């Protein structure tokens, strides 16, 4: 499947009225209107985001007391499965590749219905003061609590009931994402049949090549991870090895495309997810994320070079409208824009990655700001690039002055993004076929890396729900009661994937329209939990209060509008719309109830807890951690195991 077909599937999930119209339907570029140069906007955005990272990000790290001398959970609690210390770039690559899914491209371009200026402003302001703070905060709070997940933090600071409700929400959230992204990724690789039902090689070549590369990715990643551990490949050696392997995989994939239908690829993706979700993280997920990040960095570089080259040719003018009004065909700017943009500015899903997997890999506490805050800033830059590419292509997609789409031109977010970057790559000499295959692979990678992260998070959420312990290291080692079976990584992964597989064949479409609101509700619950964490540990948390208030108001407004819309639809359509509007109504009401319960409990804790009443947890150690940490490091660390200090 080409990037255009992939985007068509993606837009089918959006569930908003704008998803059933051309992206820029109703938007016109008026004669005499001044236009922004894409190169200028790109440079300004890069400077603003870099300043945010160097200024606000580092200030926040100092404010919260990041300690580069402290031994992290990844080192102290290394267990050969979930806790695995990694270099700063490796940990960054895991975080970045896991969070940078479809959102920063799809959400930003869809939101351009309100004009490119409000979207850019929200991406920059939201990325620096909301999203990056959210991601870094979740990562840091987890690290200061022995790698606890967000649900376990809620248990500690708010209560066991809040934890159970949150875990149920997370697991159901993961099922929806697994279903949607499995459908999208499989559709990306699926072959296109001709009239007789045979493979149409001309139309299926790029998808087949990308499929081959993706299959090779899994096996090469495991070999790469083994080689890095065996031969101690770090820094430049590790990066160069990764680049060489990527080039080799790409060359092989171009020569040996694999042609399977949609169901065949769904089976392949599901088998991969079983291993990605259950295997020790350093064996598959960690090295695959490293290689994926190399590819995504190359994509970003290609996008930047393409915009610069087009700018040199006078073809980088953003012709899309700067502002179209506070109300468009897709609804009111508040809350639609802020719910739609999601990953480009803030996404609640990121907190599950930060606290669920990344906190167990960061080797040095000082790297937390690079991994948590830095990855989000880079993702915001990807969102800005998507806006620029779409803005430049606006005049090509629309018949001048009419807002009607020209025939045969990309008209969906990923198609716009992929086509625009491919054009830019051709502008500086890359072969068109190579550019198409490269972008097809990137389009699928954006979804696949988030998909395997969700599979792993869904598995851990399932196990944590039944666990009696609130200890991150003890959950999978708990062998009492149902945890003898449900605590097993392979069992929990399969149990999580089976309902996701069932939903893949259409059921998820009925509730997908609420994904944006549920994602931001998760972000709001994360931020308010972080506010409680800061107060309980005596840290300054005032910078979280405004984001918390904004997110909760925005989310509940969006859900309230959805509930009203569902009620109206049910009154008009009756039983005929029960499977869609009825299910959405039930899900929306449950989300509101869950959000209110968690928010009210958090507010009670904020008002009732004394500052500094619950200091950071005493460091925990695993047997592997004891062996691997040097006697000097352990003796110098606060809470070093008894006997180790004496040995030093």
Identify the residue ranges that each predicted region occupies.
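Transmembrane helix-loop junctions in multi-pass membrane proteins
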Residues: 37, 104-105, 117, 176-200, ...
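Loop-to-transmembrane helix boundary motifs in multi-pass membrane proteins
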Residues: 160-175, 374-380, 435, 464-506, ...
